[in-house]
C-alpha cells in the first residue's frame, strides 16, 4: 500500500523507512510502512484504512526492543510524543462502574492520572511530582514509554507499573477503543498476558498524595542511583535479561566472567553486566549473537537459564 491509498490522514506516512534511529541500540533494518500519527483520533482513522491482515508493530522509545537487520514486515506505528496526552482525570469518569473498586474513587487522598502510550515514563514521574504524588517516583527509572511499561509490567527500584494501574484503554486492529481493567489480564514479573491482538494506548494510574518536596527528592535519589550503576548515555536497551527468582541477572553474568565480552561492536557493559552496548558500529545480528552467547554461557556455568527481557523482532 502506498500513500495515495490513504485519505484524511494528519500524521506522517513513510515507505521503506529506516528504523535504527528510533531504537536506543541504534540498530535495525527498515519498516515496509512507518506511521507517525498526529494523535489518537488520527491513529483510529489510519487503522480503519489498513487491510485487516496487515501486520502491526508498535514502537515507543525503542528501549526494550531489538529490531533485526532485515527490518519489519507490515506497518510500524510510532507512539512516542504522538499519543502524548497526560492529565489528572475526573474520578467519576474513570472505570467506576466497570471496576467496582469504589475505594479508588472515594477521595481518600488518591489521584488518578490518565497517560497515553507515547508519554515517556520520565515525563509521567515528573508529572506525579507536580501533583505531589510521591509513589510515582519509580517511573523515573524506567527508560521507556507508558505503552511499553504497560505491555511488559516494567519496573524500577522496587516499583512495578501494574501495581498502580486501575484501568487501561486498548485499541484493536480496526481502530476501536476498549476500556479494560486489571482483572482482565494476567500480570507477571515483566510480562502481561491477555492483550488478545490489541495494543495499549493509555493507562489510568492511581497514586497517593504526598509531599511534593519528598517526591522530587525521591526521583533525584533514584536517578543518582541509576547513573552510578548503569551505563547511561550509551547505546543500549536497558536490562537484557529478567532477574531470576532470588538472584540478579547482572550478578550471574559478571560471575561468569562475561563483563567486556564482545561480538563485533556489541559488548557486555563493564559497568553493569545486564547491559549490552553498541560501541558504535554493531549490527542487530552482533547484539543478538551476544545475547545468545551470554545466556548459553551462564547456563553452562550456573545451571540457570536466563530469560530475555528485551523483545527481538523483525527479519534476519
Swiss-Prot record:
Co-factor(s): FAD
Top-level EC class as recorded in UniProt: oxidoreductase
Principal location listed in the UniProt entry: cytoplasm
Coiled-coil regions, chain positions: none
Protein's UniProt keywords contain Metal-binding: no
GO MF terms, alphabetically ordered: FAD binding; UDP-N-acetylmuramate dehydrogenase activity
EC number in record: 1.3.1.98
Domain FAD-binding PCMH-type: 27-225
Annotated Gene Ontology cellular component terms: cytosol
Catalytic activity of the protein: UDP-N-acetyl-alpha-D-muramate + NADP(+) = UDP-N-acetyl-3-O-(1-carboxyvinyl)-alpha-D-glucosamine + NADPH + H(+)
Biochemical pathway: Cell wall biogenesis; peptidoglycan biosynthesis
Gene3D superfamilies per record: 3.30.465.10, UDP-N-acetylenolpyruvoylglucosamine reductase, C-terminal domain, Uridine Diphospho-n-acetylenolpyruvylglucosamine Reductase, domain 2
Top-level taxon in the UniProt lineage: Bacteria
Pfam families according to UniProt: FAD_binding_4, MurB_C
Keyword Cell inner membrane belongs to the record: no
Compartment(s) of residence: Cytoplasm
PROSITE patterns: FAD_PCMH
Residues annotated as catalytic: 190, 239 (proton donor), 309
GO-annotated biological processes: cell division; cell wall organization; peptidoglycan biosynthetic process; regulation of cell shape
Function: Cell wall formation.
Family listed: Belongs to the MurB family.
Name assigned to this protein: UDP-N-acetylenolpyruvoylglucosamine reductase
Organism listed in the record: Coxiella burnetii (strain CbuK_Q154) (Coxiella burnetii (strain Q154))
Amino acid at each position: 500500500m502506498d500513500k495515495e491509498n490513504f485519505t484524511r490522514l494528519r500524521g506522517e506516512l513513510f515507505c521503506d523507512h529506516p528504523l535504527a534511529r528510533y531504537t536506543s541500540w541504534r540498530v535495525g533494518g527498515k519498516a515496509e510502512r512507518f506511521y507517525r500519527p498526529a494523535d489518537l483520533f488520527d491513529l483510529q482513522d489510519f487503522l480503519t484504512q489498513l487491510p485487516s491482515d496487515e501486520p502491526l508493530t508498535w514502537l515507543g522509545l525503542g528501549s526494550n526492543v531489538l529490531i533485526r537487520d532485515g527490518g519489519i514486515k507490515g506497518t510500524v506505528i510510532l507512539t512516542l510524543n504522538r499519543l502524548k496526552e497526560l492529565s489528572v482525570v475526573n474520578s467519576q469518569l474513570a472505570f467506576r462502574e466497570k471496576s467496582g473498586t469504589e475505594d479508588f474513587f472515594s477521595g481518600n487522598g488518591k489521584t488518578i492520572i490518565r497517560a497515553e502510550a507515547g508519554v515517556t515514563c520520565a515525563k509521567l514521574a515528573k508529572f506525579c511530582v507536580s501533583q505531589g504524588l510521591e509513589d510515582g517516583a519509580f517511573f523515573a527509572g524506567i527508560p521507556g514509554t507508558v505503552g511499553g511499561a504497560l505491555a511488559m509490567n516494567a519496573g524500577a527500584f522496587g516499583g512495578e507499573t501494574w501495581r498502580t494501574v486501575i484501568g487501561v484503554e486498548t485499541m484493536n486492529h480496526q481502530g476501536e477503543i476498549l476500556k479494560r481493567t486489571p482483572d482482565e489480564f494476567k500480570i507477571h514479573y515483566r510480562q502481561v498476558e491477555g492483550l488478545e491482538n490489541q495494543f495499549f494506548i493509555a493507562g489510568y494510574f492511581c497514586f497517593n498524595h504526598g509531599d511534593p518536596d519528598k517526591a522530587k527528592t525521591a526521583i533525584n535519589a533514584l536517578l543518582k542511583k541509576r547513573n552510578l550503576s548503569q551505563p547511561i548515555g550509551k547505546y543500549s536497551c536497558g536490562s537484557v535479561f529478567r532477574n531470576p527468582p532470588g538472584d540478579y541477572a547482572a550478578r550471574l553474568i559478571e560471575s561468569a566472567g562475561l563483563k567486556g565480552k564482545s561480538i563485533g561492536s556489541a559488548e557486555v557493559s563493564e559497568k553493569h553486566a545486564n547491559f549490552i552496548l553498541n560501541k558504535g558500529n554493531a549490527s542487530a545480528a552482533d547484539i543478538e549473537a551476544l545475547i545468545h552467547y551470554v545466556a548459553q554461557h551462564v547456563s553452562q556455568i550456573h545451571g540457570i537459564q536466563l530469560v530475555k527481557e528485551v523483545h527481538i523482532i523483525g527479519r534476519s
